[in-house]
Amino acid sequence: YYKENRVMQLHFTKTNGPVDEAINQLIRIADGIHRPEYVREMILAALKAGQEDDDRADLKLMNTTLKEMRFTAKVFGPYRNVRKVTVFGSARTSPDEPVYDMAQEFGRKLAEAGYMVITGGGNGIMEAANEGAGPEHSFGVNIRLPFEQRANPVVEGNPRLITYKYFFNRK
């Protein structure tokens, strides 16, 4: 049955008695929790997911998604006030192609102008833009694929390289 104007609730309004008390106690015990109102909502969402969904794959996806998003915030957080440009391009572009040189020069000019460069962290155009910007001005947001790219040498080992399991988190 489909309800036409169904709206997803983004805030939990129903009280949960002892569960609310336990969550509040957990937040107090954890100490140093920033924005406890949001942490409380995330804990409630996790508990509700565990109650409502018994599908292992769904729960694994939610768990991994939250972990990837948390790590992304940790990596990008120190650069919150630094402007960034995302460069998209083929991993199959060869260094001897003119467009490779253009991407490299573009990355260099962005870094000189105070921008950081975000790429998919792969080869080709992505590597060229990272090379131009240099490792200190580069982010790589890679994806784990069974047959595809590894991180390019510019971002490999860089603390600003994030390797995702899910494409939707990478975007």
At which residue positions do the language-model features occur?
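Short, Lys/Arg-enriched N-terminal segments with co-localized hydrophobic residues
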Residues: 1-7
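Glycine-rich beta-alpha loop segments
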Residues: 9-143, 148-150
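Short, hinge-like loop/turn segments at secondary-structure boundaries
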Residues: 135-137, 155-160
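Glycine-rich phosphate/ribose-binding loops and adjacent secondary-structure elements
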Residues: 144, 159-162
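Active-site/ligand-binding-proximal alpha/beta "capping" segment
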Residues: 163-171
